[in-house]
Amino acid sequence: MRISPGEITKVLEDRIKEFKEEIDLQETGRVVQIGDGIARVYGLNSVMADELVEFVETGVKGLAFNLEEDNVGVILLGPYSQIKEGHIVKRLKKIIEVPVGEELLGRVVNPLGEPLDGLGPVEAKHTRKIEIKAPGVIYRRPVNTPLQTGIKAIDAMIPIGRGQRELIIGDRQTGKTAIAIDTIINQKGKGVYCIYVAIGQKTAAVARIVDKLREFGAMEYTTVVVASASDPAPIQYIAPYAGCAMGEYFMYNSKDALVVYDDLSKHAAAYRQLSLLLRRPPGREAYPGDIFYLHSRLLERAARLDDKMGGGSLTALPIVETQANDVSAYIPTNVISITDGQIYLEPGLFYSGFRPAINVGLSVSRVGGSAQIRAMKQVAGMLRIDLAQFRELETFAQFASELDPATRAQIVRGQHLQELLKQDQYSPLPVEEQVVVLYAGVRGYLDELPVESVRKFEKEFLDYMRTSKSSLLKLISEKKELTQEVEDELKKSIQEFLEGWHE
């Protein structure tokens, strides 16, 4: 087969016409120092704050954290043992994003959205930037829908609404995580998607939490984001923002979400470590000057959106650990001032067997009251007054024999109500069951019982209501208030039960 010179010429001319000169211009820099999860990079003159960069030789990504005159401080989001001085770093010209959506429900992932549960890759269709601006005032509406925790003391006296930020604060081992996990378990069937962010915790502790969530069927609507104690500080630093982005996906799609940050004390410590390594000037307790902004920009993203924005909500339950009950330390006071109230847990109550160890006097919910259902308001108002009076008189309880009958009656009522507020872990109650039990307490039906029989009464009374009076519970659940007719029926039910009940 012979090819004529004319054909060869034509092919060459066509190829020359098709040729496009492509120049791939990339801005790169070089590593001048590496260690402790931090790289100093020379070059990258146009890099933006918080922009993603890539270490070409290893494929590890990092965040441009410190922009200085002659170098860029990069925090590394992966293993850095293979990175050497002189390695090339290139800009990616984008902000860090994480996978979001319903595909993450039931999964345990790291803050980059990579699976940690061995169940295969996460097939998410959407991603979101981990740092975005919080919704403005104009796009929000007041908190007016309850988020039931299933815990009597909280739902009655420190109610939480959808879109609220409620801090859980207390010393280590006082049951802070237990309250958050019970709240997640209680969202079953309520259409609330949950994100649990574990920051700086032991991997074994997180594994136990995941097992419990699976046991109670809560992983169906929950994503667990883990930045464990063994993860580098940069991963712990981005964890809450990644969890928030996953929750925001549901909020901006007209759904309700709950995100738990466990805990922000360790998050602040990780940020302090990064800041000190990058030689940022230290302030109080060696934290950098923008530590308040670190948490405020995270927690401000929790909101209840107005109908024009879809009406979704993101509720935040940040957890902060105190040292020796010191609520006036730097991070606790910061987060208290950012949030809409706090649930304060006290070691003294915890060790005396009062669990959940909530100090009702120091705990407050600044906006949740308007979200409480009317039936609970009718019961909780009296409960709050009775407990406040009891706390005033408690010191006199040891002289009970010398007190007048009215004071003695108040002390007895308070002791019974305190016993009634005790609750086992992993046993959240539906709101209608809480209402009937607390109604029996505040109306004095338990005053004649020995204090030690109160828990037994509660268990057996609820069994009786579920089996014989389920229609009444359903009515309270639907009407959400104690009408005269419902109240009469409830009084009759309590009296009937007490007549046939044996301590």
From Swiss-Prot:
It catalyses: ATP + H2O + 4 H(+)(in) = ADP + phosphate + 5 H(+)(out). It is a peripheral membrane protein. It holds the Pfam family ATP-synt_ab. GO terms for cellular component: plasma membrane; proton-transporting ATP synthase complex. One of its GO terms (molecular function) is ATP binding. ATP binds at G170, D171, R172, Q173, T174, G175, K176, T177. Keywords: ATP synthesis, ATP-binding, Cell inner membrane, Cell membrane, CF(1), Hydrogen ion transport, Ion transport, Membrane, Nucleotide-binding, Translocase, Transport. F-type ATPases have 2 components, CF(1) - the catalytic core - and CF(0) - the membrane proton channel. CF(1) has five subunits: alpha(3), beta(3), gamma(1), delta(1), epsilon(1). CF(0) has three main subunits: a(1), b(2) and c(9-12). The alpha and beta chains form an alternating ring which encloses part of the gamma chain. CF(1) is attached to CF(0) by a central stalk formed by the gamma and epsilon chains, while a peripheral stalk is formed by the delta and b chains. Produces ATP from ADP in the presence of a proton gradient across the membrane. The alpha chain is a regulatory subunit. This is ATP synthase subunit alpha. The lineage of its organism: Bacteria, Thermotogati, Thermotogota, Thermotogae, Thermotogales.
